């Protein structure tokens, strides 16, 4: 803090950027709140235009492979690409960004909830039905809590029903929505070429 105050006094334009889970680790080790002294900037997945300009992708490729620039060089070897997404992105996000930084009593349940969310992405699924499909699920509050963690990690969201009645919104069944379509594709057995010739599956 002394060095920071000194740089500020000397009008030295210094900015410190914490990316990924490091911002959460910093908050855990602080005795101060840093109120008014930091700004959160959301850096989401790459858009179609960005992936098109950088790698020449078309719309179908973007729908299947998603907006992860780090995996773009692997799409010609889809088995390797799927392992990269599962191991380097999904597993790392759950194991490090969530499990190491927050208290999760049932990590296996959270992983199964994520897999279920990928399977039902774009669909509404009640918490009661989730309890029926997930072993040792506990209660709906636990599932809702874990779903919020997955949303914060940029993996899976549970979109609430849009209504002017706040009570009905809070009590509504969530609509699963993955943050990136690659999270679904990496769990499917089909390749990009195989899925695009199946109108029922491709949509």
Q: Regions from the language model: what does each represent?
A:
Residues 13-14, 21-23, 27-124, 157:
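Interdomain motor-coupling "hinge/lid" segment immediately C-terminal to the ATP-binding subdomain
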Residues 1-17:
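Conserved Walker B catalytic segment
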Residues 19-20, 179:
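Alpha/beta-hydrolase-fold catalytic nucleophile elbow
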Residues 83-203:
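Accessory nucleic acid-recognition modules appended to NTPase machines
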Residues 4-8, 30, 134:
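Active-site catalytic pocket residues across diverse enzymes, especially alpha/beta-hydrolases
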Residues 2-3, 30-35, 191-193:
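Short, glycine/charged-enriched secondary-structure capping and boundary segments
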Residues 2-5, 61, 115, 132:
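Surface-exposed charged/polar residues within alpha-helices that form helix-capping/stabilizing sites
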